[in-house]
Amino acid sequence: MRSTRRSSGRNVLFQASRPVGAVRAIRASIALIPETFRTMLTLSDIAFDDVAALLARYGLRLERVADGEPIPGSYWGECEAGLIGSTVYARGDTPVHSLLHEACHLIVLPPERRAQVHTDATDSIEEEDAVCVLQSLLGDAIPGAGSERILADMDEWGYTFRLGSARAYVEQDAESSWQWLAAHGLVKLPERSLIR
């Protein structure tokens, strides 16, 4: 079961009861301040073309938004990535983990569902959990990023997991998500590697 509440103008998701092995709270209620984002890896820290090429492998388009402009389709606002259809929107100050998380929401959807997406990709807990795993794998496919950095930035942003960190979740507590991703043709098991 999942409940939604408003806190400081943000949607904060909490799951009231979850099976063993799943994410306890997808995003924690924290006040995001500019200093927090400055410590995270952002799109301006890596090559835009590398990220665009990675997303294109999954039929997605990355659209650069000018600095200081609002990001279309951003669920969280500020510098967080946005989604409209098969396009991911990001600015130079968008955290890479945010861009990958939102892109993964589209990647796990079939094309007919992607076309309907605007801002909020899913209400599926299974998809949300799988996205947390997939974004770390995509991090390894981007020069200058890497899964370790993506997982650390997820923790800093405020994701909360039962085992205490995003890395512990992905490595020790996400078997159902790995199985879900494999069933949807996105990862190979037991290697735990990307198919594309």
Model-derived segments and spans:
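Active-site recognition of the HExxH zinc-binding catalytic motif
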Residues: 97-110
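Long, well-structured alpha-helical subdomains associated
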Residues: 142-196
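Low-acidity, Ser/Thr- and Arg-rich intrinsically disordered low-complexity segments
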Residues: 2-10, 17-18, 24-29
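Auxiliary, metal-adjacent structural segments of Zn-dependent hydrolase domains
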Residues: 33-82, 89-93, 137, 141-142
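Post-HEXXH active-site segment of zinc metalloproteases
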Residues: 108-137
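Alpha-helical, largely C-terminal catalytic domains
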Residues: 33, 103, 162, 166
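Short, amphipathic alpha-helical segments
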Residues: 45, 125-132, 144, 148
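Secondary-structure capping and boundary motifs in well-ordered enzyme cores
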Residues: 91-96, 123, 127
